[in-house]
Curated annotation (Swiss-Prot):
Coiled coil location: none
Record keywords: Repeat, WD repeat
UniProt organism field: Caenorhabditis elegans
Database matches in InterPro entries: CIAO1/Cia1, G-protein_beta_WD-40_rep, WD40/YVTN_repeat-like_dom_sf, WD40_repeat_CS, WD40_repeat_dom_sf, WD40_rpt
Protein name (database record): Probable cytosolic iron-sulfur protein assembly protein CIAO1 homolog
Function: Essential component of the cytosolic iron-sulfur (Fe/S) protein assembly machinery. Required for the maturation of extramitochondrial Fe/S proteins.
Any single GO BP term: protein maturation
Length: 337
């Protein structure tokens, strides 16, 4: 079901096995960014066509911006910018010019490791989260400079990830405190719209929306995947929307956490990666009123922990998945249905 078509070392050499934390596809599907413990961000090109041998070629290494491991990378929705978040407590924005990315902004203020940074759908806002338990909202002005819009501390522990709704300025965060939080702009400030405690037993490691933004999946330390659905859709005020858990699946025969979850925008397949070095696929079956999370199986492996999985967002390449691992590799997979 998932066929490995390539293995690539983040640092370029087989003997360099520094941990790879994350990969992120450009929205056009032909560019990939990766980051890891080597303090560098690398930009790759996807070479080839779906009916031929495809591979990744490293085109740029950005290694002058951070002094500690780079935990996350994300492209802006217009494709012009790339953002990285680091354990050095900084966030760096790179801008693409003549096909190359160069640093244009360094955002500082978090008190400790920044775990995630991601642009909103409109690219007007940038959200960051940190080990300091805070979620920051940055706003971009006409000169493409960023200023702090709001600082919230809704969690009681390390905030692991933030993710934007695919069509709205709605943000969700997940944390070491076993909870997820939703945020909206109330016209003056960003505010917490909903709190859901006890989502998992232990850390909630990762979150992902479906294409329409009506469903959300989470994975956690308890090796469980959980499905949430949006209620009150179509209400006069979007801030009346609430989310509730409707299904869960507990992965058996493992004691390891699930670290990452990604929802395929074309075929609705969900991928996870975890501490047992395995990649799993899931699908939501049954009716919307009675959904069931179906485990399609273990479909891929690494030598060490799988820290992140990411589907290609371009429909032409939507069957491509990348995985990032402690073993120092980025693996390229093809979904065969």
């Amino acid at each position: 079901m998932l066929r490995q078509i390539g293995e690539f070392y983040h640092q370029g050499e087989k003997d360099d096995t520094s941990r790879v934390w994350m990969t992120c596809w450009h929205h056009g599907g032909r560019i990939l960014a990766s980051c890891g413990d080597d303090k560098a961000v690398r930009v790759w090109s996807l070479v080839g066509e779906p009916d031929s041998k495809m591979r990744l070629e490293c085109r740029t290494t950005l290694d002058d911006s951070h002094t500690r491991a780079v935990r996350s990378v994300a492209f802006s929705n217009d494709g012009k910018c790339l953002v990285s978040a680091s354990f050095d407590a900084s966030v760096v924005v790179y801008q693409q010019e003549d096909g190359e990315f160069a640093e244009v902004n360094k955002l500082e203020g978090h008190e400790s490791e920044v775990k995630c940074a991601v642009f909103s759908k409109s690219d007007e806002f940038l959200a960051t989260c940190s080990r300091d338990k805070s979620v920051w909202f940055w706003q971009q002005d006409e000169d493409e400079d960023f200023s702090v819009s709001s600082i919230l501390q809704p969690h009681t522990q390390d905030v692991k990830q933030v993710a934007w709704h695919p069509t709205e300025d709605l943000l969700v965060s997940c944390s070491y405190d076993s909870s997820i939080r939703f945020y909206r702009f109330d016209g003056e400030d960003w505010v917490t719209q909903q709190k859901i405690d006890g989502c998992h037993v232990g850390t909630v490691w990762s979150i992902a929306f479906d294409t329409e933004g009506h469903r959300l999946v989470t994975v956690g330390e308890d090796h469980c995947i959980q499905l949430f659905v949006r209620e009150n859709i179509g209400s006069k005020s979007a801030d009346q929307d609430t989310w509730k858990s409707v299904a869960r699946y507990d992965v058996e025969n493992t004691r390891w956490p699930l670290y990452s979850v990604a929802w395929n925008s074309t075929n609705d397949v969900i991928a996870t990666g975890g501490g047992d070095c395995k990649i799993r696929l899931f699908k939501i079956s049954s009716t919307p009123e009675s959904p069931v999370i179906e485990h399609l199986g273990v479909v891929g492996r690494h030598e060490l922990d799988v820290n992140h999985v990411a589907w290609n967002p371009n429909p032409k390449f939507s069957n491509l998945l990348t995985s990032a691992s402690d073993d120092g590799t980025i693996r390229l997979w093809e979904l065969e249905i």
